[in-house]
Amino acid sequence: MKLTVELIDEAMERADSLPIFENSHRQEQANLVGCIGEIVFERYLAHHQVTFKNDTISTRRDYVIGNSLALDVKTKDRTVRPQRHFDNSVPLYNHPHQRPDYYYFISLLREKSLGATDPRRFKEAYLMGGISLQDLDRVAKRWDAGQTDPSNGTTFWTACLNVQMDQLTPNDQLLETFRNA
């Protein structure tokens, strides 16, 4: 999905109204990235006529899909288009109390030449798919802060659970789950 000026402006307004969370590594920029992902996800659900309740004020989940399905959106920004072997992360500092039924992952493509704080650097959003909490806990690779993943050179700033793109439930299957929630 191409990111419009209108969407970025809406995300900036939403991000500006949020507090900086204690464990936030990127602070205001983390809020902006998260808000872009949330708006993209909301538009995706609306386009596919999936009912949802916005609960982003909570740190336990971002949305209630249908009548009961709790879901949290995780958004990562990248300088290259996402590929099937790339990872999606769930930080562990929220994991004890953030126990949604599903996590949903969005990747943002950013243009490096525009600078680290220019909100217009985000050009595209990729809706990657999701994973149930049970599957995440079963298949994810745990990384501790300071560890380096030898497959891609990433050194983790916080403990997290990682799943590869190909471990996610595809969007068409998730839409069916969401519609039946």
Regions found by a protein language model. Give the residues of each.
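Nucleic-acid endonuclease domains
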Residues: 1-66, 74-181
